[in-house]
């Protein structure tokens, strides 16, 4: 079968490897010739296109499954909406081939909850950040543009990812701990995390879903910020975390539930908590 990835970065390349190992043909959209060569070296067929330039999207190939995992480049000078909303709408409108199954990676920041309460897929979205607002709008446009007029033939899946960690994604935080840089956030606020391998497994499981749906992708246990950074410091030999106690950072965050992910989508987490996942991520980082 043929697969296409739009946004073949930290998560996308890991999904691509799984698909290649299963014997599928995998293509990925990229804007750069240099990155195209890198993709070829990984066994991935590059497709030179840019979601912000509709005229380039005519080359999108016909595939069986599409993973849309675009992230916003903060150095681009563009607002998140340009990437998440305008880019997605360009893709849906101007791509000549949309598959019968499309998986959209979104984020748990679509929720504006900051009182420490639990959220699930039925909790109303009311994002507090520009990125969260853009992702919430993109989800709405995804259902309208991809699925609404093709309900008999298409299955759309939205995966709202918690904060992703894994090999190579902890270096900046470890460096900050080692330098004893103050953390400007409420130490008692809640964090929701997922190991990258479990997000990849969620994508693979979403290929088997028989109905369109939205899933929160997070591990089994929300964790308070102080516990997370203390654990990270212990595992890396860094000093204990220092929090900036100016009284301004009072948000309690939210606690995400993965019940639907586990019970309905059938994902079996490899790393149910950071006690399982952090040691792997640290030891696998080169």
Model-derived segments and spans:
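Mid/C-terminal beta-alpha module of Rossmann-like enzyme folds, strongest
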Residues: 200-252
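NAD(P)-cofactor binding segment of oxidoreductase domains
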Residues: 61-103, 137-140
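N-terminal Rossmann-fold NAD(P) dinucleotide-binding loop
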Residues: 12-13
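Alpha-helical substrate-binding/gating segment
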Residues: 173-182, 188-215
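C-terminal amphipathic/interface module of NAD(P)-dependent oxidoreductases
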Residues: 45-52, 249-286
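Conserved Rossmann-fold NAD(P)-dependent oxidoreductase catalytic core, especially the SDR/UDP-sugar
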Residues: 89-130
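Catalytic helix-loop patch of NAD(P)-dependent Rossmann-fold dehydrogenases
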Residues: 115-158
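NAD(P)-dependent short-chain dehydrogenase/reductase
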Residues: 145, 155-191
């Amino acid at each position: 079968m043929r697969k296409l990835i739009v946004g073949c970065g930290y998560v996308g390349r890991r999904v691509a490897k799984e698909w290649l190992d299963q014997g599928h043909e995998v293509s990925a959209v990229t804007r750069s010739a240099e990155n195209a060569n890198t993709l070829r070296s990984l066994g991935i067929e590059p497709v030179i296109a840019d979601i912000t330039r509709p005229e380039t999207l005519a080359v999108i190939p016909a595939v069986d499954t599409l993973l849309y995992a675009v992230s916003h480049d903060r150095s681009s000078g563009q607002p998140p909406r340009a990437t998440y909303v305008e880019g997605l709408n360009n893709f849906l409108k101007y791509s000549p081939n949309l598959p019968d199954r499309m998986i959209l990676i979104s984020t748990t920041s679509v929720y504006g909850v900051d009182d420490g309460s639990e959220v699930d897929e039925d909790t109303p979205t009311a994002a507090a950040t520009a990125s969260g607002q853009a992702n919430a709008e993109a989800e709405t446009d995804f259902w309208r543009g991809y699925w609404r007029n093709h309900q008999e033939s298409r299955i759309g899946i939205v995966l709202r990812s918690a904060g992703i960690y894994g090999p190579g994604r902890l270096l900046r935080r470890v460096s900050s701990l080692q330098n004893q840089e103050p953390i400007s956030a409420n130490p008692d606020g809640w964090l929701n995390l997922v190991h990258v391998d479990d997000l990849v497994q969620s994508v693979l499981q979403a290929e088997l879903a028989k109905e369109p749906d939205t899933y929160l992708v997070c591990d089994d246990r929300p964790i308070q910020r102080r516990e997370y950074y203390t654990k990270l410091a212990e595992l890396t030999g860094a000093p204990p975390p220092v929090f900036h106690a100016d009284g301004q950072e009072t948000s309690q965050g939210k606690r995400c539930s993965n019940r639907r992910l586990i019970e309905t989508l059938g994902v079996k987490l490899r790393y149910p908590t950071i006690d399982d996942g952090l040691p792997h991520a640290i030891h696998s980082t080169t």
